[in-house]
Amino acid sequence: MKYELVVGLEVHCQLNTNSKAFCGCSTRFGNPANTNVCPVCLALPGALPVLNRRVVEDAVKLGLATGCSIAPSSILARKNYFYPDLPKGYQISQFEEPICTEGMLRIDVGDGCRDIRLIRIHIEEDAGKSIHDIGDDTYIDVNRCGVPLLEIVSYPDIRTSREASAYLQKMRQIVKYLGISDGNMEEGSLRCDANVSVRLFGAEEYGTRTEIKNMNSFKNVEKAIEYEMQRHIDIIDGGGTIVQETRLWDADKGETRSMRGKEFAHDYRYFPDPDLVPVLVDQEMLERIRLELPEFPEDRERRFVSEYGIPPYDAGVLTVEREIADYFERTLTVCGDAKAASNWVMGEVMRTLKEKYLDIKEFAISPERLGGLIGLIGKGAISNTIAKQVFELMQTGEASAEEIVDREGLAQVSDTGAIERTVDEILEANPKQLADYREGKTKLFGFFVGQCMARMKGKANPQVVNDVLKSRLDG
């Protein structure tokens, strides 16, 4: 391919504060339309904004996490434009003096890591929402007006659609680890605009870019960028000219369509907001927030390998989400077996979460109860097969694994005499299979094990069953 893709991303991260950026209204998603409002949200005359301190702290957290320089003083500015869902006629944002500048995000794209530079992270407020699907009219819901956002702007360092998706996934992971956002793309907590252009390989100058909006999933980000790249190439190869514009991604049709001409900074007539004082971040605040930062995914992954001895793959899976990593460590504290805890969390726990569309916080089995279940397996009190039955029962109540085993009579049978009697009965009932085994069809060993376990309702100690069978079959 003679063309090189060039992409820069603008990510809007909605903060999970209880109140809005410049007033005390709730930020709760899903409330009835126009109920999370006040004179500030509605831009009523005389209503003055007051900056939410938590918004500043969250911006500093993300800035530190991405290696940015934190400005001791930054300015809130008015971004002026008209839209029906923007009551003030301007959006409070930052322009010439943002709170965070010059950071970096390292992404893993499978065949190695790449560093994507960040131009800036700045504070801004969200706009309202236009609702077009009620009859023939358009309605305005201003609940979202003033909800705090951080806009993260990257340099045009991204060269493939896969890198763009990896960047967005990494950013989502970081904001979730920091606890500043839930990163939910479907609800709009994490939104992404892509500035896409192409140029000849080896060229220094960037091509004319288009901005792509309305990408609400990682997969759609990849598809939209791929489509737009090919659209640019087709136009250039056909002798045409790329128009700098904003385009909307249509996931149903798998294409972008023109939305409006691309605005420039001067179109918004930015100027410092006279109603708001500069945002100050002193050294004491900076150091306090630095000490509050969590252990980040890469560091935690390395520690899981070195401290617990689990494989790098397991450590990578367990640390993708902070809550899963926390759950694993609390489970391990109880059971003391890192590999067993890893297998259960990655296996049965994650399977259940996926099947039931649950978050780990909603999962019925606490890590302490799961640790108790794994401990019973380690002591030989129950088999893995029985443990899976107990696991299902634990989701329907608060009983411990031990209580369920006692109540249901599921304790493992390790009595050699009882197992020998069962083995003898199975061998007597299957003379053909016994003869075939002794003639060399040794794969039938698994058949006999299965028959014994079924006869004893899965409660027999598998190791004892294996030992008794070997002595009977090979003796």
From Swiss-Prot:
Q: Which InterPro entries match?
A: Asn/Gln-tRNA_amidoTrfase_suB/E, Asn/Gln-tRNA_Trfase_suB/E_cat, Asn/Gln_amidotransferase, Asn/Gln_tRNA_amidoTrase-B-like, GatB, GatB_C_1, GatB_Yqey_C_2, Gln-tRNA_amidoTrfase_suB_CS
Q: Which reaction does it catalyse?
A: L-glutamyl-tRNA(Gln) + L-glutamine + ATP + H2O = L-glutaminyl-tRNA(Gln) + L-glutamate + ADP + phosphate + H(+); L-aspartyl-tRNA(Asn) + L-glutamine + ATP + H2O = L-asparaginyl-tRNA(Asn) + L-glutamate + ADP + phosphate + 2 H(+)
| Pfam families in the record | GatB_N, GatB_Yqey
What top-level branch of life does the organism fall under? Bacteria
Reported EC number(s) for this entry are 6.3.5.-
What family is it from? Belongs to the GatB/GatE family. GatB subfamily.
Q: What's the subunit arrangement here? A: Heterotrimer of A, B and C subunits.
- Report what the protein is called: Aspartyl/glutamyl-tRNA(Asn/Gln) amidotransferase subunit B
Q: Which gene encodes it?
A: gatB
